[in-house]
Amino acid sequence: MLKLTKKADYGLIALKHLAVHQAGVPATVRSCSAKDIAESYGIPLPLLSKILQKLAKAGFLRSEHGTNGGYLLARDPRDITALEVIRLIDGPIFLTSCFTEHGMCSHSERCSVREPLRKVHEGILRLLSNITILDMTHDDPAPAGIPPEQLYELGGGLIAPGLRNKTI
C-alpha cells in the first residue's frame, strides 16, 4: 500500500503550521520553535527537530537563533509542493518495483498491468506536485480544494468516469 511515512507527514504538518503562523502574525514574531510545533500536534520533539533540520538544510526553512528564535519558511508556501517535501524526507516514490531506479522485476516481460500502473504512478506524482503548502492551509474537504473533475485531469484520467461528478 502506498503510504506516507510519519516523518513525511510530520514534515508537511510543520510546513503547514509555519505557513499559517507566518500569515497571521507581525514579521517580528514569525518564527516558531520546534517545541511549539511538536506540542501543538503531539509530535515527538527529537523526531520533529531532525525533520526541521533536514527541511532547513534543503532550503525550505530558515532557522533563527536567540530568545525569539525558531523556524521560518524560507520559500513562499505557494512554491513548496507536497511532492518535493515527501521526496526530501522519504526519498523517491515508487508505486511498484516496475518504477524503481532499476525499473525491472521478474515479471517485466509478461506483465499485463505495467502500463496501467505506470499511469497510476504518474498520476500520483502529478497530483502531489500540484498540491502546495499554501493549498494545505485551506480547510477544504476536497484535497487542496481541487474539484473532482480537476483531480481527474491532474491524475491523468485516473478517476473512474462515474466518480468525476461526485464529491471525493
What is the predicted role of each segment?
Residues 18, 51-56:
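Basic amphipathic alpha-helical segments that dock to polyanions
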Residues 46:
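Key DNA-contact positions within bacterial/archaeal DNA-binding proteins
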Residues 59-73:
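Beta-hairpin "wing" of winged helix-turn-helix
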Residues 102-168:
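C-terminal regulatory/oligomerization modules of transcriptional regulators
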Residues 39, 56-57:
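Alpha-helical residues within the helix-turn-helix
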